[in-house]
Amino acid sequence: MTPIPSFAEAVPVWARIGCLSFGGPAAQIALMQREIVDQRRWVSDKRFLHALNFCMLLPGPEAMQLAAYLGWLMHGVKGGVVAGLFFILPGAAVMLALSFIYAAFGNVPLIAALFFGLKCAVLILVVEALLRVARRALKGAVPWVLAGAAFLALFVFGLPFPVVVLAAALIGFAWPDAFAKGGHGGAGTEGNSALDAMLAADPGRIASMAPLARRAGLVALALWVWPVALLMPVGGVFADIAWFFSKMSVVTFGGAYAVLVYVAQEAVEHYRWLSASEMLAGLGLAETTPGPLILVLQFVGFLAGWREGGGAWGAVAGSALTLWVTFLPCFAWIFLGAPYVERLHDVARLKGALAAVTAAVVGVMANLALWFG
């Protein structure tokens, strides 16, 4: 059996995953499963799926949080931090460069034509994602009704996205049997992985890692809150960025496509940082870079800083601030929740809440496709 890798051996693997994680969460999760489970047998299929279900319950990009959680399982807090950062930073660097090109040359005919083609491709990707999620989530009459209700709530009544997500979660929590067939399923196989062998030899390992994980989670929360607290009394575009994307970090259930509805309601229609067409271009850029699709938020923060914060330096500051308040909470949720994951494995009501949110996301994505179109 392959032994658990050393931290130094794991780092290049996380870097490789971060640089190759194109194609959205489904492709990214498949890449991680191939690298970590199938090829190296560091983690068993069952534990991988268990970890994925936990990350699906959290706000934020599930693929990035899955990498951070698996890194924590193998090497503690430093493993989680490195795995999570490598999943974010390559794509963030590319997105920053592409954002500069868009802001500086987006009106040049050739560049404008390229971005128009990108927008058309993204519309197709949104529809494909809608159909894929619908096939997985809408199994039974109740999920279909909930998806339709979510669509009407947004398209007809204009309800805020967080209200729709919260209502769906409460319905699934109260009525888990109606959603038992939806969402991520499959128990997986235990297998003979390096991590399972290590945990069998040291049953108290996770419990011994818990105190440091909780401290790391609290530090991440503090680092997330302090710039918001400093900027809010000052006001201005950077205070708006800090506050808005901090709110986003606690309601980003259902993936990047679903979150774009909330971004559209606020960043486009309320703050007027960018247009719907530019939002579509930003999603296209996020689709073409490695890392989580939620990096589209970095593009929004970049344009807000570019237009209202003082040009290039304001754009860099807006981009960095957006990344800070978007991803620090992701690390906090992982480190605070990781020690308790095993207890969540068979909680039917939590699974019901997740499946109901996934069903509602179908309606949310249908609204998004019409809004972009």
Language-model segments: residues:
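Multi-pass membrane proteins that catalyze or facilitate reactions on polyprenyl-/lipid-phosphate substrates
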Residues: 1-58, 69-289, 293-373
